Regions:
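Solvent-exposed loop/turn motifs of extracellular immunoglobulin-like beta-sandwich domains
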Residues: 3-7, 36-41, 68-70, 78-90, ...
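Solvent-exposed loop segments of extracellular immunoglobulin-like
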Residues: 50-62, 137-152, 244-258
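Extracellular juxtamembrane-to-transmembrane boundary of type I single-pass membrane glycoproteins
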Residues: 304-322, 336
């Protein structure tokens, strides 16, 4: 091979080698994902291993950077106070590809300003109601998780993964609740959590609503059998009892034939009918009605007054005693003679 041809061959080989080594985009961002609270500082490095660098820098709505003849460029913000920064690292080269751009995976977040519960004044047993979690001024929504708890039991969870809004938003999340009798006075709480993923703070930013105790209303339910049969001896005393559970607390009404020796007393949620010196006039059915605005429960107590010692027996017994005494006294006098 001629010397001139050899030089051309070597030159082409060198050119092709240099082109091959520079024909790739080599942009390295560190850290590759940044999670930063709104208003906090942030520092991110960007670099390349290629040698044919013309300039490097950052495109951003805050603190843009342009550094000629540098393989490293730093985006440094002392206080990130914009939501649409969208920083991109760019590197311009002398050879193809002439420019390479890499967008920073940046998450700017703000914990909720407040979390509260919106609920009806009361719930009715077996009827679906809605308890709403209200989350104010939180960002970004796509990382937000809203949960409703009854005590330590989670009742529901709502996320917003398809919401691309970067700016702070307000979210109202309704949760259906169908209460039981046991839920009366239960404590409900709403928890808003930002699940920010890799690079985010640990534990996740979380805000909890003040607890809310919810009354559950229901009609009265008897705490004892609805039918009872009781007995008392004539002249004896007896107390008939009636009690029920309800919300609001039930009021009691007794129905029976009026008698002078009957007294009604209601105390500590129990209503009683007190009957001293029972007689046949008290022998009847006593109806107890426990009422509130949502219903009534009825209890029937049948009282039987059993007769005492018959008067004829008492008279005969007295006569017998008198005769016995007379005989004894007469015998003593006879012996004395």
């Amino acid at each position: 091979m001629e010397p001139g041809a050899l030089l051309v061959f070597v030159g082409l080989l060198f050119f092709n080698s240099e082109s091959a080594s520079s024909a790739v985009c080599d942009v390295n961002i560190d850290p590759s994902r940044v999670v930063v609270r709104f208003g906090d500082p942030v520092i991110v490095n960007c670099s390349t291993t290629r040698e044919d660098v013309f300039e490097a820098g950052w495109e951003s709505s805050i603190n843009p950077v342009n550094e000629p003849n540098s393989k490293i460029t730093v985006w440094n913000v002392s206080s990130l106070i914009v939501w649409d920064a969208e920083p991109k690292c760019f590197i311009n080269y002398m050879n193809e590809p002439r420019q390479c751009v890499e967008k920073l995976d940046l998450v700017i977040y703000k914990s909720p300003e407040s979390v509260s519960l919106i609920a009806p004044e009361f719930m009715k047993i077996g009827v679906e109601s809605t308890i709403t979690c209200q989350v104010l001024d939180v960002a970004p929504a796509r990382y937000l998780s809203v949960k409703l708890y009854k005590g330590d039991e989670q009742l529901g969870n709502r996320s917003f993964t398809h919401d691309s809004t970067r700016f702070p938003v307000n979210e109202s999340v309704p949760f259906p609740v169908t209460p039981t009798r046991a839920d009366n006075g239960a404590e409900y709480t709403c928890v808003a959590e930002l699940q920010l993923g890799p690079g985010g703070p640990k534990p996740n930013p979380t805000k909890r609503s003040p607890p809310l105790k919810m009354p559950v209303v229901y009609k009265p339910s008897l705490l004892s059998a609805a039918e009872e049969n009781v007995e008392v001896r004539e002249g004896g005393s007896i107390v008939l009892k009636c009690s029920a559970d309800g919300n609001p607390a039930p009021k009691y009404e007794w129905k029976y034939r009026i008698a002078d020796n009957v007294q009604e007393i209601t105390k500590d949620g129990v209503s009683t009918v007190n009957i001293p010196r029972a007689s046949s006039s008290n022998d009847r059915v006593y109806e107890c009605h426990a009422k509130n605005r949502y219903g009534v429960a009825t209890k029937n107590i049948t009282l039987t007054v059993k007769g005492g010692t018959p008067w004829i027996m008492i008279i005969l017994l007295i006569i017998g005693v008198v005769l016995a005494i007379a005989i004894i006294v007469g015998g003593i006098k006879f012996c004395g003679r």
